[in-house]
From Swiss-Prot:
S-adenosyl-L-methionine binds at G75, E98, L99, N131, S132, L151, T229, E230, E231. It comes from Zea mays. It is an enzyme of class 2 (transferase). Keywords: Methyltransferase, Nucleus, RNA-binding, S-adenosyl-L-methionine, Transferase, tRNA processing, tRNA-binding. It catalyses: guanosine(46) in tRNA + S-adenosyl-L-methionine = N(7)-methylguanosine(46) in tRNA + S-adenosyl-L-homocysteine. This is tRNA (guanine-N(7)-)-methyltransferase. NCBIfam families: tRNA (guanosine(46)-N7)-methyltransferase TrmB. Its main location: nucleus. GO terms for cellular component: nucleus; tRNA methyltransferase complex. The keyword tRNA processing applies. The lineage of its organism: Eukaryota, Viridiplantae, Streptophyta, Embryophyta, Tracheophyta.
C-alpha cells in the first residue's frame, strides 16, 4: 500500500490520511520520547544533515552551516508553516515541535520528500517530537530564537484545563528566556476567547510589547499565519474569523 503522492521533481509526498491522529494531545501527560539534557546535546546532524554531516571525516563538500536554530514552530501540525517559511529564509535553521507521534512522522516524511524533489532546498527545516510545554529549555539556549510561532493551538475550553494552554504567564517566562531581544512571537487562533487570552497574557508580561499594525502588515511572515497551515486553510474554507497577537521581545534594565 502506497503512503505517498507525487511531488514536483519526482519526489514522493506522504499522504495525510495515513498519519491521522487526534486534533490535539494532552500536554500534561507523560509521553515517551528522547529529550536532550541541554541544548548542547541536540544532535543537529539528525535534523540538518546538509549543514551538519554525521560523518565529519567525509570528503564530500559541506554547505556553510548556520550557527544554530533560530525559528521554532510550537505545535507545528503537518508542517505547512515550515514549508512556507523555508524559501523565505533559506539561510535560517528552523524546527517544528509536535507532540503527536504520527503527525511528527508525517512532517519528517514530507520534508524528506521535498528535499528529494528539490535538491538544495528545504535543508533548513526539521521537526522533533517533544512536549514544548515541558522541554523548551532543553532545546534552546538563552536568547537563541528570533521567532516563535503558536498557530491555532488547542483552546482547552474548560476553565479547569486553561493550565494546559501553550500561552500562559509562566510559559512566557520560558519563551522570553530563549528569545533574543527584538525577537517576534506570533500567535493566531480561530477561537476569539483564546485569542483574547493570548493577547492578554502577552500584554501583561513585562518582556513583551505589541508590534505596531503597520509593521505587522509589512512582515512577509504575516500572510503565512492565515494561509500556510492545514488549520488556517480549514478556517478559510469555512468562512471563519481569525484572531492574531504578535509581540516583540523587549529588554529590562535588570536583565
Amino acid at each position: 500500500m502506497t503512503r505517498t503522492n507525487d511531488a514536483s521533481g519526482g519526489g514522493k509526498l506522504p499522504r495525510k490520511r495515513f498519519y491521522r491522529a487526534r486534533a490535539h494531545s494532552n500536554p500534561l501527560s507523560d509521553s515517551h520520547f528522547p529529550v536532550p539534557i541541554s541544548p548542547e546535546e541536540v544532535d543537529l546532524s539528525q535534523h540538518y544533515p546538509r549543514y551538519f554531516p554525521a560523518d565529519k571525516g567525509s570528503d564530500g563538500e559541506e554547505a556553510a552551516a548556520p550557527q544554530q536554530i533560530r525559528f521554532a514552530d510550537v505545535g507545528c501540525g503537518f508542517g505547512g508553516l515550515l514549508v512556507g517559511l523555508s524559501p523565505l529564509f533559506p539561510d535560517t535553521l528552523m524546527i517544528g515541535m509536535e507532540l503527536r507521534d504520527k503527525v511528527t512522522e508525517y512532517v519528517k516524511e514530507r520534508i524528506l520528500a521535498l528535499r528529494g524533489a528539490n535538491p538544495g532546498q528545504y535543508d533548513n527545516i526539521s521537526v522533533v517530537r517533544t512536549n514544548s510545554m515541558k522541554y523548551i529549555p532543553n532545546y534552546f539556549r538563552k536568547a537563541q530564537l528570533t521567532k516563535m510561532f503558536f498557530l491555532f493551538p488547542d483552546p482547552h475550553f474548560k476553565e479547569k484545563n486553561h493550565r494546559r494552554r501553550v500561552i500562559s504567564m509562566q510559559l512566557l517566562d520560558e519563551y522570553a528566556y530563549v528569545m533574543e531581544v527584538g525577537g517576534i512571537i506570533y500567535t493566531i487562533t480561530d477561537v476569539e476567547e483564546l485569542g483574547e487570552w493570548m493577547r492578554s497574557c502577552l500584554e501583561k508580561h513585562p518582556l513583551f510589547e505589541t508590534v505596531p499594525e503597520e509593521e505587522i502588515k509589512a512582515d512577509p511572515v504575516f500572510k503565512l499565519l492565515s494561509t500556510a497551515t492545514e488549520e488556517s486553510q480549514k478556517v478559510a474554507r469555512n468562512g471563519g474569523q481569525t484572531f492574531y497577537a504578535i509581540f516583540r521581545r523587549i529588554s529590562l534594565q535588570e536583565e
